[in-house]
Amino acid sequence: MQQQTSFGPLTLITPTAALKASVHGGRAKCLQRLVRMDLPVPITVALSFDAVHAAAVGDLPDMDALLAPFGGAPLLSVRPSSEDPDWGGPSAILNVGMNDARHAELINHVGEEAATRVYLRFVQSYAIHVARLDPDEFHIPDVADRGSLVAMMATYEAETDEAFPQDARVQLAEVLRSMARAWDGTTARLLRQAKGAPADAGLGLVVQAMALGTGRGECGKGVIQFVDSTTGAPRIVGRYISSWLAELRDVHPDAEGAIYLTRDPRGQSLEDLFPEQFAQLVTYGAACRKRLREEMEVKFTLQDGTLQILDAVRLQRSGRASVRIAVALAEDNVIPREEAVMRIEPAALSELLHRQIDPKSSCNCQKAGCSS
């Protein structure tokens, strides 16, 4: 007789925790696989589809139980975890738990402007995505000082008739409620149905401890992939943003202030500055490819010189790249040849057989006009 596994609303992600992609979403299950591979993943708690659905109607999980694994005064990120990554989800909310006390503490570590900019970005994100206020009212100035923070707090209070919440439990509860309701909205439902999701598709959420750049050693954030997204050829691609720049923007290949990953004549690289951590990244990437049976994009941080893996997601790729990646995985005995064939979408063959213009190339406009 097969034993039924029961799933609670909150699950601390450990190697032996009861987690399923159909209950907690693909991101939560992938994080568990990374933990099982002994990769250095920050403390993470997964909320089940049922827990998120309940949050949408106001039945929130126990906030004290949710926060307990993270210790005192944590800063957290909350990210969506749908069953299929292609179905999307609400925007991630970072630095949940930021308040006046943490702001004062961070000033002593990183200086007033850097700490204030992090606080401003959290207030902006909370106001727009959680309180659903007008984005035009929450512009972050070029120079982040105490005056701009006071002004933004005053704007929030004027728009909501209440002060910006200082309790991490209140902040986290409202973030969970907002993300759950966004998933249940009509627009979000229609968009994911257009991608093949069932109308009642569930959403999980993952709450993860943030690694902040407050140590004496090197701190920063980056993203790395090990094949070219356009061609599928082996190639390390990505960027690394050092120190507090990593907490101030989403990392992407053209991020301002980023340094290269591999040695490059155009500037500094992670491989030159921190060869040991770079070698670890390459090792982790190879392990992900073998164990997850896929080419992945890996998000990582350095915290006081120590490498941490935040997430790994299936690499977005062109049709041409998908063919080459599937062939390479089969040739390396990572997946069977039959599975490699089934992974290739029919449309990819048409793209492969016809000449293509590199979508990342710059185009020079020769003529412009209009017709009727």
Predicted regions span which residues?
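Nucleotide/phosphate-binding sheet-loop regions of phosphoryl- and nucleotidyl-transfer enzymes
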Residues: 1-370
